[in-house]
Amino acid sequence: MKSLWLDRESPFTSDALPDEKHYDTIVVGAGITGMVTALLLSRSGQRVVVFEARTVGAVSTGNTTGKLSLLQGGVLSALRSQYSLKVVKAYVEANKSGQAWLMQYLEQQGVPFQRRTAVTFATSDDGGQRLRKEAAVSRDAGLDVHFSRDAGLPFRVVEALELEGQAQIHPMEVLDTLARDIRAHGGIIVEGVHVQNVGSEHPMEVSTSTGAFTADTVVLATGSPILDRGLYFTKLEPHRSYAAALRPRVGSDVPQSMYLSIDSPTRSQRTHPTAEGDLLLVGGYGHTAGRAASPKHHLDELLGWAKQHYPGAEVTHTWSAQDYQATNLMPFFGKLPRGHGRILFGTGYNKWGMSNGVAVALSITSDILGGQSDWATTIHHRVTSPQGALQAIRLNAGTAKRMIEDRAKVRSNPEITEDTHPAEGTGVVGLYKGEPAAVSTVEGKVCMVSASCSHLGGLLSWNDAEKSWDCPLHGSRFTPEGKYLEGPATHHLQIPGRGKD
């Protein structure tokens, strides 16, 4: 599976690992937050290096649906159920700031994007009630939303809420431009460097897979913070969702707005212009990472829905993305606990990273260079509601229960031996010499790795859509060979009989 955005000849080539070992700021992660932060700091005259464990945009940003919208499904009414209107308005102002900065930047740089009307639609009476709540909160928060009964979709819609003047982007073209701009201001971007730890002394020692560096400031711009200070992995629920690009049947009429359902399962829709005509992009059908019996089934349901309503459309790409939802629904950002004010981070964008991610980059940069926006101050000083605290308790109780159940279950599975060869495209978990092991077969290659996540030891589950090992506790993911892909883990999986790889 490869996203429409990543399926291309990339114009980006990684910088060589620098000889210089000290920087003003080391940015960890080359997605939208990390790259905007690196650009703003480089422009200020700082010496900045970006370390990316995989490739630029390889994780969330390169797998997004690319919507830059202030109309975000049921997000605002959910926030209002936990916070004052002042806090909800601050969230909206943050997203306005992120959206405005990115749209202005793309216009200045000549990067194409399309302005579109964003539409949240309901297909049930219950969904209609939720939509009316969202409309009321949206208006209270200053958004000029309005209702429509003709959403232009090829299926029945009870009601639709619209917000004009939003945008859709090609996320990798955005990152390409940011990368060129960072380098033009003296910044360095190095792929294939996995940051594993950050010290607490000043200057801070940054331990990586390629050696140690030091920095006055470190920015963690990863999906989930890779440091356990603050225990944010206990406050975040990892979600995987699915997307596909389809070429519509010749002559068919495809709606041009950006759509999102308020009913479950979530269904998202937009177009993408190409030389051969518009592609239709659909998404949704998500689940908690690592906990679906068959992730492929979720993807198949999405494709079935798209083909039902757009008959004759040809699938060109399918992919998946991982996002993190905070238990209190508000993104976490700012100074990491026990980081002496020198480690900053952002996480919990809950599928709205194009606006939230840029907003967090603006706030982090202000923290480093001096100053802060009113919206950031309001969000930082919010009080977690009883509802948010209860959700955190539920999340962690469920995680502990899952770990206990999985450890008991693995002992009843068939034993793993050197002769265990799963069917093509499948993976199995069992005991190998008394320890949990995971064996998979992908493209004829059989691989055995530890079935214990390198983060906190969760028992991994096989992802039959992406052919990966996923942790059901906090969302870390690994290749069949045990190489780290994403999540709070900082090391590859152990190989039975060899220890850490």
PLM regions with names:
Residues 1-25, 43, 483, 490-497:
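Extreme N-terminal leader/targeting segments of oxidoreductases
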Residues 2-8, 74-79, 103-177:
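Flavin (FAD/FMN) cofactor-binding and adjacent substrate-gating region
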Residues 23-50:
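N-terminal Rossmann-like FAD-binding beta1-loop-alpha1 element of flavoenzymes
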Residues 43-63:
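Glycine-rich FAD pyrophosphate-binding loop
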Residues 129, 136-137, 161-216:
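Helical element adjacent to the flavin cofactor pocket in flavoenzyme catalytic cores
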Residues 165, 263-264, 292-301, 308-395, ...:
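C-terminal catalytic lobe of FAD-dependent flavoproteins
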Residues 198-271:
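Flavin-dependent oxidoreductases
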Residues 244, 424, 428-501:
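Rieske [2Fe-2S] iron-sulfur-binding domain
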